[in-house]
A protein has these predicted regions:
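Single conserved hydrophobic/aromatic residue that forms the stacking wall/gate
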Residues: 1-13
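A conserved nucleotide-sugar
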Residues: 53-98
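Aromatic "clamp/platform" in nucleotide-sugar-dependent glycosyltransferases that forms part
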Residues: 102, 121
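Short hydrophobic beta-strand element within catalytic cores of glycosyltransferases
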Residues: 138-141
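A short, well-ordered alpha-helix in the C-terminal region of glycosyltransferases
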Residues: 167, 180-194, 206
Length: 216
């Protein structure tokens, strides 16, 4: 689960000799998110620093002051859960933020949310963003090499400076206040479809033909 830039730089491969095929979408959508839910979603392991959920909670504490009817749902498990719960208590957000354990039915969370936030400090790929877009959710993501590669110039996504709490809060307000949600949702679903497993398999077949028959 890594992007093309990481493959090329880590393995010292020239661009013309390298072809990256992204991981396929394995979580198939079961419904579609709506703005009316007023719910922000994040999914990932509660590991030390990685997913940046501490950043997200702090940013949400700023955002919710102007959007009090919105909630934040974080799905995951791991060693930082106690830290996140202490932050929720510190900001008195027990009624606005909920932590949920991992579930095989994560589609239910996607389908009943309004936007997705990837607050990671680093990321190899971030398939959860694609899963969210498959459910019609606009995405806010840390400005990382892979998110820039996947989301740059995409109308249903916005990037914020990694770790910048104020900027993330501003991005959440920007998304929450937009009026073109149906259009953004359509764009998100359309883009996520390019990661459908059949299309990824086609990419692999084409690449193998190039290698075997020398048609590169």
């Amino acid at each position: 689960e890594i992007g093309s830039g990481l493959v090329g730089s880590e393995m010292c491969i020239r661009d013309r000799c390298c072809e990256v095929i992204y991981n396929p979408l394995t979580v198939l959508p079961k419904g579609r998110g709506k703005k009316e839910y007023r719910r922000i979603l994040a999914v990932g392991r509660f590991s030390f620093g990685h997913k940046g959920f501490d950043i997200l909670i702090k940013a949400f504490s700023v955002f919710v002051k102007t959007h009090p009817d919105w909630t934040l749902e974080i799905v995951g498990e791991g060693p930082e859960e106690a830290l996140y719960r202490s932050l929720i208590n510190e900001y008195e957000l027990e009624k606005s933020i909920a932590l949920h354990p991992f579930t095989k039915e994560v589609q239910e969370y996607y389908a009943h949310s309004s936007m997705y936030v990837l607050s990671s400090r680093w990321e190899g790929f971030g398939l959860v963003m694609i899963e969210a877009m498959a459910h019609g959710l606009p995405v806010i993501a840390s400005d990382l090499p892979i998110t820039r590669e996947l989301l740059k110039d995409k109308d249903m996504a916005v990037l914020f400076e990694t770790g910048n709490i104020a900027q993330l809060a501003g991005c959440m307000s920007y998304m929450a206040d937009r009026t073109d949600w149906e259009w953004m949702g359509n764009k998100a679903v359309e883009y996520a479809d390019t990661f459908h497993i059949e299309k990824v398999c086609d990419s692999w077949n084409n690449l193998l033909k190039k290698v075997v028959y020398g048609t590169r």
